[in-house]
């Protein structure tokens, strides 16, 4: 099948590469000329395990190509995926200007019947907006259909999530139109939900909002555990074994970040308000999430005392492991708060330091290893739970720190082990461990 994918971010590039790998002829389009030239040269604009090899393989087999010419891509594709950014406005409303611009160009360039697929995360009603914009910009009437096919990939495992998703959601005006997507996805052999277009749009937002709710809920429980002397990890296990609840996303820590959850929750709150419903539950979820970084820094300040003469090693900057994405990363707020309190910051991340340099305060030192960051520091603060940190030589780390103090924002290590190693160890929703 001939496919055009508009947008080469995480969603668009992975979608295009996977469909090419399944044997389709894919053209990926982006208006960022530097990004397209880099892709043509085999350089990935994002960090995603396995993506570079998949792109190279399919470019070499002439199933995948890249261009800045949107018209060329539109004319090529029987199916056109819109996978452009949908950033939030200050109000929380989703900015659909990129989606509308692509829809207008599709209308102008459409030369035969097309299926236009919204892959971007968009509010309910966007499919109808896209249909109206395309129709309005057609120089002559050409039939087309608009479908919603939301993505559920996770950065760091995007290829696996695209090839083996939990479910494939197809929102289409008719069963006949849906069958085009069913045929395209047939090699993947995963459960498919075929529904109407508005329902598919709501499924995406409702899914992300519910996962955000689980994260904020267990973080609120962690606050209770800290005050009561309970262990949130045991509470999580006891809850997660209930099949009605499940353990996924029931992980206390610094809260959610990234390119999806924060903006999707805000967008759903805004959409609900536009439709006449005050989504108070989601407002509470957002408020709990906003408190997490400040809560950790308060614990740091209470344990270390005044921070204006302290050096702190910050381990992990990306919003989660296995990505270089700094969007809504909790590290930004943690570092800003520590810096504002006078602390000297040394930071390390396996993949995200180049992106972090544009966001963190001037004066932050970026280290080449966690050990370099820790040398002579008064404490280490773990923000992102990379596997590299899980397997650190903690004896070496203790010897490098001026004081053996660790603040673990992700509950990466076991308190009893840290006690045996002689650390003062502060984690989330658990009693502090203090050396004898």
What are these regions (language model features)?
Residues 1-436:
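Structural/interface elements that position substrates and couple domains in central-metabolism enzymes
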């Amino acid at each position: 099948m001939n496919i055009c994918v508009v947008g080469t971010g995480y969603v668009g590039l992975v979608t295009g590469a996977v469909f090419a790998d399944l044997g389709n002829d894919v053209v990926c389009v982006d208006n960022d000329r530097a990004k397209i030239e880099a892709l043509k040269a085999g350089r990935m604009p994002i960090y995603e395990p396995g993506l570079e090899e998949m792109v190279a393989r399919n470019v070499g087999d002439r199933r995948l190509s890249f261009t800045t010419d949107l018209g060329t891509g539109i004319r090529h594709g029987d199916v056109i995926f819109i996978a452009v950014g949908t950033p939030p406005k200050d109000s929380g409303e989703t900015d659909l200007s990129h989606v509308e611009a692509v829809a207008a160009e599709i209308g102008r360039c459409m030369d035969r019947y097309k299926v236009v697929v919204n892959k971007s995360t968009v509010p309910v009603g966007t499919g109808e907006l896209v249909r109206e914009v395309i129709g309005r910009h057609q120089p002559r009437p050409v039939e087309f259909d608009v479908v919603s096919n939301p993505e559920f990939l996770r950065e760091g495992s995007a290829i696996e999530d695209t090839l083996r998703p939990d479910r494939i959601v197809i929102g289409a005006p008719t069963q006949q139109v849906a069958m085009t997507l069913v045929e395209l996805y047939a090699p993947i052999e995963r459960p498919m939900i075929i529904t109407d277009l508005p329902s598919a749009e709501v499924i995406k937002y409702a899914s992300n909002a519910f996962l955000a709710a689980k994260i904020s809920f267990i973080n609120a429980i962690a606050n209770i555990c800290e005050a009561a002397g309970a262990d949130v990890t045991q509470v999580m296990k006891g809850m997660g074994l209930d099949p009605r609840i499940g353990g996924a996303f029931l992980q206390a820590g610094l809260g959610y970040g990234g390119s999806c959850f924060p903006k999707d929750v805000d967008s759903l709150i805004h959409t609900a308000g536009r439709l006449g419903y005050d989504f108070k539950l989601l407002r509470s979820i957002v408020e709990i999430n906003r408190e997490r970084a400040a809560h950790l820094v308060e614990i740091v300040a209470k344990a270390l005392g005044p921070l204006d003469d302290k050096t702190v090693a910050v381990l992990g900057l990306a919003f989660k492991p296995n990505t270089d994405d700094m969007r809504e990363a909790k590290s930004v707020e943690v570092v800003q708060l520590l810096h504002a309190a006078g602390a000297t910051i040394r930071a390390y991340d396996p993949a995200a330091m180049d992106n972090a340099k544009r966001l963190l305060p001037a004066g932050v030192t970026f280290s080449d290893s966690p050990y370099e960051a820790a040398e002579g520091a008064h404490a280490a603060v773990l923000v992102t739970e990379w596997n590299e940190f899980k397997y650190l030589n903690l004896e070496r780390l203790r010897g490098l720190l001026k004081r053996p103090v660790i603040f673990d924002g992700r509950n990466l290590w076991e308190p009893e082990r840290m006690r045996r190693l002689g650390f003062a160890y502060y984690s989330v929703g658990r009693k502090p461990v203090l050396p004898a």
